[in-house]
């Protein structure tokens, strides 16, 4: 654990496979102890500042409950609670927060804002979500897949829909574990080509594969994991109708799920829009792992906080 103390958690690309395996192993261990009624407090007396420029159900619940289960405490900060909106620099904000806190979780729009905060902070910074990446979510996804299948290398994960922040982090995470990640998106909504190329290099190193296609059936065929996300993310509401038309053939339906492996599970980072990116019979059906996945945000983030803040 000492090797990771003080580290930032901004992108899965920044962490080695061994380090991510340590996160997953600790998450499973802590989860088992919690279920057994054993309470560990490795973060006793520690304070986590949670800055939310974008609101969230799962991110706030999992971080706030998580650090309290670990013996620490959390301070919620909205955009209205800080002076950033009035022109105070990120550098000054980071240096001030570092004097009061033991860690910072930030959920915001600009990825550059998180990177800059980490550059100036003298305490660990955790990326709770940006428009470019969602690493904590994908650690929870990997944990869920590991629990279901017992291993990660060789699994095929098909992501159907918008090539957004979740798709970027799934490519990074899947590549690190030698998975076959296929993203199916319409032209104009595919993942960032530079991030695809980066993930492909990583995948080749670990015996995996990362692909981008336009055909959902091709992507899903034989997959153990079928994943989707909303078609219009927070801040894209004005594009909602345009996106509904673009993604009309990308809904995860029962018919599409039949193309996947017999043991396939369905995953979604939530919130979900039933009848848009996923049919109700899929997300509410027996193959759905979405609520296990949501719970695993708690366990994944507890492990991350323990490793970098204890």
UniProtKB/Swiss-Prot annotation:
Pathway: Amino-acid biosynthesis; L-arginine biosynthesis; L-arginine from L-ornithine and carbamoyl phosphate: step 1/3. The gene is argF. HAMAP family: OTCase. Carbamoyl phosphate binds at residues 56-59, 83, 107, 134-137, 269-270, 297. Reversibly catalyzes the transfer of the carbamoyl group from carbamoyl phosphate (CP) to the N(epsilon) atom of ornithine (ORN) to produce L-citrulline. Gene3D superfamilies: Aspartate/ornithine carbamoyltransferase. This is Ornithine carbamoyltransferase. L-ornithine binds at residues 165, 229, 233-234. The keyword Cytoplasm applies. It catalyses: carbamoyl phosphate + L-ornithine = L-citrulline + phosphate + H(+). Belongs to the aspartate/ornithine carbamoyltransferase superfamily. OTCase family. Its main location: cytoplasm.
């Amino acid at each position: 654990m000492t090797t990771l103390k003080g580290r930032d958690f901004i992108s899965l690309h920044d962490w080695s496979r061994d380090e991510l395996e340590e996160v997953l192993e600790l998450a499973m261990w802590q989860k088992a102890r919690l279920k057994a009624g054993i309470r560990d407090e490795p973060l006793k007396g520690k304070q986590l500042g949670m800055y939310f420029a974008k609101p969230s159900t799962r991110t706030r619940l999992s971080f706030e409950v998580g650090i309290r289960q670990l013996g620490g405490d959390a301070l919620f900060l909205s955009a209205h609670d800080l002076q950033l909106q009035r022109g105070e620099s990120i550098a000054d904000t980071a240096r001030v927060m570092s004097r009061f806190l033991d860690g910072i979780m930030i959920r915001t729009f600009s990825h550059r804002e998180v990177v800059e905060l980490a550059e100036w902070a003298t305490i660990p910074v955790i990326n709770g979500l940006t428009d470019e990446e969602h690493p904590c979510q994908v650690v929870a996804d990997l944990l869920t897949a590991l629990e279901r299948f017992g291993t990660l290398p060789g699994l095929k994960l098909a992501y159907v829909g918008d090539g957004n922040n979740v798709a970027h982090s799934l490519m990074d995470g899947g590549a690190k574990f030698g998975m076959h990640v296929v993203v199916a998106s319409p032209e104009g909504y595919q993942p960032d080509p530079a991030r695809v190329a980066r993930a492909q290099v990583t995948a080749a190193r670990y015996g995996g594969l990362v692909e981008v296609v336009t055909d959902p059936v091709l992507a899903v065929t034989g997959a153990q994991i079928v994943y989707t996300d909303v078609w219009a993310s927070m801040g894209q509401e004005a594009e909602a109708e345009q996106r509904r038309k673009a993604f009309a053939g990308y809904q995860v339906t029962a018919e599409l799920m039949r193309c996947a492996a017999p043991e396939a599970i369905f995953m979604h980072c939530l919130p979900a829009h039933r009848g848009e990116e996923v049919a109700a019979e899929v997300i509410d059906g027996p193959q759905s792992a979405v609520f296990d996945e949501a719970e695993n945000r708690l366990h994944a983030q507890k492990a991350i906080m323990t490793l970098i803040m204890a």
